[in-house]
Amino acid sequence: MTWIDQAINGLKRTDIEMIAYLPDTTISPLVEAAKDDDAFETVLVTREEAAVGVLSGAWLGGKRGALLCQSSGLANTFNALSSLSMPARLPFLGIVTRRGDLGEFNLAQVTSGYNMPELLDDVNVRNHSVHDEDNVEERVRMAATTAFSTETPYVLLMETTVTGYKEESK
């Protein structure tokens, strides 16, 4: 089973109903799988921090949701997570493809992408990096359980060793 199939299964098994997303080459197969699955309502956001508001509203309306994006975009959510999700105890689940590390060609992705685990730690957002495809479903389920039971943000970083990496156009 691919990492995408496992992630979809993990989201379904934890009752995720809404997916907010911002497209990127690496995360797009997961986004497309969610869009093709009737279990999910998908919402395209123009900026990642807007997803924090969308998903907070979903939670207040009785639904669970998750953000699918890449790591450089996740950095845009820090203020919304720190000023809305955390003080209001609104859960947030991010399934995030990591840029800026193995296989990265774009220097602009390195600053936040390479340092993303530490940046998340600095803003008190718990996180876990998934390095192999063997247990993606379990990791998604565990991250969702943590986010929703504690009503706090949790980010699952999908490493390029799982997702593959974006190659430079020649």
Which residues are covered by each model-predicted region?
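Thiamine diphosphate
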Residues: M1-K170
